[in-house]
Design a protein with these regions (language model features):
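Surface-exposed, charge/polar-rich loops and edge strands
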Residues: 1-134
Length: 134
């Protein structure tokens, strides 16, 4: 799920660069609710264009590494831009990780978790995992 947040944050960094090519690294920080406040134009940016914008930014500034940060919250209503499948374990109820999963499977998390409970799957960090493909 950390990699999911990273990949989705990269999309939003690239979309920011497409809207503001002169952005500084500080401008590229992804705020908690930024994805939900995107303009319609930015929201329809293809993932490959967003990622290409990051590569172009690095090339333009002769950089090999981009230093920025993210506070992205992925919750129901979030539209995934890069991630098409996810391998994850079964998370604790009322956690932000469960919100991320719920957003990915469009609310079907209860059906998935009920199946896991009925079949004695193990939960949390050292438990069983699942491959989710919406």
């Amino acid at each position: 799920t950390t990699s999911v947040r990273t990949l989705e944050s990269l999309y939003h960094i690239g979309a920011t660069l497409l809207n503001n090519p002169e952005a500084t690294e500080e401008d590229l920080h992804v705020h908690q609710w930024q994805p939900y406040e995107m303009s319609a134009k930015a929201a329809t940016t293809p993932a490959v264009k967003a990622l290409q914008a990051i590569v172009a930014y690095l090339d333009k500034h002769s950089m090999e590494t981009l230093h920025t940060s993210t506070q992205i919250i992925i919750a129901p209503g979030y539209e995934y831009k890069i991630v098409k499948a996810m391998v994850t374990n079964f998370h604790q109820p009322q956690s932000t990780l469960l919100l991320l999963v719920s957003a990915f499977v469009h609310g079907d998390w209860q059906k998935i978790y009920n199946y896991a409970l009925a079949h004695d799957f193990r939960f949390l960090s050292y438990g069983d995992s699942s491959l989710l493909i919406p």
